[in-house]
Swiss-Prot record:
Protein source organism: Mus musculus
Membrane topology note: Multi-pass membrane protein
InterPro entries: Patched_domain-protein, PTHD_SSD, SSD
One cellular component term from this protein's GO annotations in UniProt: synapse
Function statement: Required for the development and function of the thalamic reticular nucleus (TRN), a part of the thalamus that is critical for thalamocortical transmission, generation of sleep rhythms, sensorimotor processing and attention. Can bind cholesterol in vitro.
Keywords (A to Z) from UniProt: Cell membrane, Cell projection, Glycoprotein, Membrane, Synapse, Transmembrane, Transmembrane helix
Gene that produces this protein: ptchd1
Name of the protein described by the UniProt record: Patched domain-containing protein 1
Length: 888
């Protein structure tokens, strides 16, 4: 009873609102336009988000805390050349991979000379500034001896060249650790790629060589010069490529990921314009019919104008509040399109059900009462699900900003549909009531006048006048609409046919089977190359890197951040045990080996251990570089202690798998908690992958929970709680299918796909809720009858919005970008699976599942008695008289 009272009360409120808007259409049409123009003017403050880490790395993670601790001990910007990472290296740098088209050995004489020539060209790059020309020597990261840090492979190649010049045959390169001329042991696993080795790790050949040039960015001027140097670096490498066509060179800089991420927006522009044109065309066609008076092409266009105004308003608010644009915002218009188009088409469908002899204000009031309640509830669902995604619970900033922008856009879209589109409906209603042409707004002449006109004129001005319509045919004036005719005359009977139902059930079982197969293979995508445009430096570099340099993980820093008893043999065993199984670049292990070579016990007293470390080991040229890895402190009694130190570890991997690397990170962290030695591990790439899985799933998880809560509480607003049960089951079925087929279509669960899945919850409710509501609330007739009725009432609006949405999505598939490719595949699957449920699964399943539609037996009473009438029927052929008993 309470539900019915609330339901009727809300319908009455919307009816009065519709009547009020119909009474003041000019104001409600102009106000949204003025607001959009005023807020849209804020595009003069348009800004683009520069930091990819800010957008895509989890905001709250242990890796960021570890980075701060590491920075306080050993500044990452100074040690980034030793903490190698592919795409996540901090600061400014230029990087290049050199390979050969014929898979030649890059260590032979020709290619060695070529690479050294490229190195010389890079170091001579000049960045002109007023009064001074900066070269690499001026902006490079410096060693302790004030020389530029250059990759060790350059020294190896120079030694190799000198050995060939002097005919020395005893020079050998080992892999992944080799020794330089001065005796230093260095790691070259990320500098030599595609390596073939002899016995004892001696390198036979290498198919690729990677060089990295690290730059300073300690102040704004330095950063600006470094940025320009990176640009000149790419130009120099490309020129070198043109003059040496037998080698393939892949340049990459610290700016490449950011530029290629934002490049998606630029390459998408013409495709989005094409999409807009297609949607406008389809919307106009969907609202058109042969009857030139009742056709509503302008409403199709104005529906898109409504969505555009709402999007513009939301963008203006984001700009005014200091928000910055990023390429993930490309999905917002499609979120708006899916929600806004259905709302406008549902209003138009409700308009067609009103009586033509009513006044426009009364018809508008009926439209609002009929369609705005369900549209308001679905809008509330959008606001709740995206609102939870926009909350601080969302740990990935790109997802939070997207949800926040979508919330604002959805809210204004709802308000503008109520006001702008509603007033547009009023204006077209007056045009219809005055029998004016729906496009040209010219009075349509009566049929007797049209008979005297040419055929083309009669075709353009075909209309059905009320005088031609019989009293009982009033409701059928819109049946000449193609989609209405198709659903009512053909599709509804076909889908509910007894012989069709088994095939639909079979298709659904196949759908569930394939969805389950994909669901069991879901993988999380934390690869940053999945969000950039294709045919870019990032994609080319990443492809080459994965091909040639996938044998070892990024270099992991192993930091002991408190003073421990390094001289104690048990502590030594613990430290060696923790690092066992890794390729190690360790001062500690080198020092212990140094002591053994001197026939000195490693179990020395503290003072002797420390003094020999400082005064002997670190003064030896081949070990002097380890001074950067140890922090000493003097106590009050002049006793020296090692307060912190670091080592570098590299894991052997079959391929650079981020999930495998994350598992390694978690294993080392668990070990650090239980071990006697307090240490942390860090690599710049950990900032992106730490808690990425939980951060990624949190918005979807929270949105699903909030959607369930909203469906539960909205059960008091709908006339029957069974509606919400059916909606929940439908959403689960759709989301399960989308996730499964998304995986089979090689789409990983990343930031973009999670946002699409949140949208999929709302899109499903948008389209399925009216169908289910009409079916559940239907009484007296059979299930089949109410399934047909639900399709006839709401199917046209669903079909119209689906057609417009799909034609708008297709150009997105052609955009040369991984981000838009993910966006297209997810949105297409959401639309297709939802359509499949609306027009196939639900119409069939509802015909044999609850609620029951059996006619309740009426109590016998004096006012409701059956009257029996005898009717005599004469059989003409046999002249027999037949008595037939009929019930009246």
């Amino acid at each position: 009873m309470l539900r019915q009272v609330l339901h009727r009360g809300l319908r009455t409120c919307f009816s009065r609102l519709g009547h009020f808007i119909a009474s003041h259409p000019v104001f409600f049409a102009s106000a949204p336009v003025l607001i959009s123009i005023l807020l849209g003017a804020s595009f003069s403050r348009y800004q683009v988000e520069e930091s990819v880490e800010h957008l895509l790395a989890p905001q709250h993670s242990l890796a960021k805390i570890e980075r701060n601790l590491v920075n306080s001990l050993f500044p990452v910007n100074r040690s980034k050349h030793r903490l190698y990472s592919d795409l996540q290296t901090p600061g400014r740098y230029g990087r290049v991979i050199v390979t050969s088209y014929q898979k030649a050995n890059m260590l032979d004489q020709h290619h060695t000379d070529l690479i050294l020539k490229l190195h010389t060209a890079v170091t001579k790059i000049q960045v002109p500034r007023p009064g001074f020309n900066y070269t690499f020597a001026h902006i490079c990261v410096l060693n302790n001896d004030k020389t530029c840090i250059v990759d060790d492979i350059v020294h190896v190649l120079e030694e190799l060249k000198n050995a060939r010049a002097t005919n020395r045959t005893n020079f050998a390169i080992t892999y992944p650790i080799t020794h330089l001329k001065d005796g230093r042991a260095v790691y070259n696993g990320h500098q030599l790629g595609g390596v073939t080795v002899h016995s004892k790790d001696r390198v036979k050949s290498a198919e690729a060589i990677q060089l990295t040039y690290y730059l300073q960015s300690i102040n704004s001027l330095n950063d600006m010069v470094a940025e320009r140097w990176e640009s000149s670096f790419c130009d120099t490498v490309k020129l070198f490529q043109k003059s040496n066509s037998k080698v393939k060179i892949y340049p990459y800089t610290s700016s490449s990921l950011r530029e290629d991420f934002q490049k998606t927006s630029r390459v998408s522009e013409r495709y989005l314009v094409t999409s807009l044109i297609l949607v406008v065309t389809m919307a106009i066609l969907c609202c058109s019919m042969q009857d030139c008076v009742r056709s509503k092409p302008w409403l199709g266009l104005l529906g898109l104008v409504t969505i555009s105004l709402a999007t513009l308003t939301a963008a203006g608010i984001i700009n005014l509040t200091g928000g910055k644009y990023n390429s993930t915002f490309l999905g917002v218009p499609f979120v708006m399109l899916g929600h806004g188009l259905y709302g406008t088409f549902e209003m138009l469908s409700s308009w067609r059900k009103t009586r033509e002899d009513q006044h426009v204000k009364e018809r508008t009031a009926e439209v609002y009462a009929d369609s705005m309640l369900s549209f308001s509830l679905t809008t509330a669902m959008y606001l709740v699900t995206f609102g939870i995604g926009a909350s601080p619970f969302t740990n990935i900033e790109a997802a939070r900003i997207f949800c926040c922008n979508s919330c604002i856009a959805i809210l204004f879209n709802y308000l503008y549909v109520l006001s702008f589109y509603g007033s547009s409906l009023v204006f077209t209603g007056y045009i219809e009531n005055n029998y004016q042409h729906s496009i040209f707004c010219r009075k349509v002449p009566k049929p007797d006048v049209l008979q005297e006109k040419p055929a083309w004129y009669r075709f353009l001005l075909t209309a059905r006048f009320s005088e031609e319509t019989a009293e009982g045919e009033e409701a059928n004036t819109y049946e000449s609409h193609l989609l209405v005719c198709f659903l009512k005359r053909y599709y509804c009977d076909w889908i509910t046919n007894t012989y069709v139902k088994p095939f639909v059930v079979l298709f659904y079982l196949i759908y569930i089977s394939f969805a389950l197969m994909g669901y069991l293979q879901v993988s999380e995508g934390s690869d940053l190359s999945n969000i950039v445009a294709t045919a870019t430096q990032t994609i080319e570099y990443t492809t080459a890197h994965q091909k040639y340099f996938n044998n070892y993980s990024p270099v992991i820093g192993f930091y002991i951040y408190e003073s421990i008893e390094y001289w104690n043999s048990s502590v030594q065993e613990d430290v060696l045990e923790y690092t066992k199984g890794f390729v190690r670049i360790s001062w500690f292990e080198s020092y212990l080996n140094y002591l053994r070579k001197l026939n000195v016990s490693t179990d020395l007293p503290k003072k002797n251990f420390t003094d020999m470390l400082r005064n002997s080991f670190l003064k030896t040229p081949q070990f002097s570089h380890f001074q950067e890895d140890i922090i000493f402190s003097k106590k009050y009694n002049d006793e020296v202690d090692v307060v912190a130190s670091r080592m570098f570890l590299v894991a052997k991997t079959m391929e650079t798998n981020r999930e495998e690397l994350y598992d390694l990170l978690e294993t080392l962290r668990r070990l650090s908690v239980t071990s006697k030695v307090k240490f942390i591990v860090f690599n710049p790439s950990f900032v992106y992958m730490d808690r990425y899985a939980s951060s990624l799933g949190a918005p979807l998880h929270n949105s699903c929970i909030s959607a369930l809560f909203l469906l539960f509480f909205s059960a008091f607003l709908v006339a029957d709680s069974l509606i919400n049960v059916w909606i929940t089951l439908t959403v689960v079925s759709v989301e399960f299918g989308v996730i499964g087929f998304m995986t089979l279509w090689k789409v990983e669960l990343d930031c973009i796909s999670v946002l699409c899945l949140i949208y999929g919850i709302n899109y499903t409710i948008d389209n399925c809720a009216p169908l289910l509501s009409t079916f559940v609330l239907g009484k007296d007739f059979t299930r089949t009858k109410w399934v047909k009725n639900a399709l006839e009432v709401h199917g046209v609006a669903i079909l119209q919005s689906y057609l417009c949405y799909i034609v708008g999505l297709f150009p997105l598939a052609a955009v040369p970008s991984n981000l838009t490719c993910t966006l297209f595949r997810c949105l297409f699957l959401i639309a297709f699976v939802t359509f499949f449920h609306c027009f196939a699964i639900l119409p069939v399943i509802l015909t044999f599942l609850p609620p029951s539609k059996k006619k309740r037996k009426e109590k016998k009473n004096p006012e409701n008695r059956e009257e029996i009438e005898c009717v005599e029927m004469v059989d003409i052929d046999s002249t027999r008289v037949v008595d037939q008993i009929t019930t009246v």
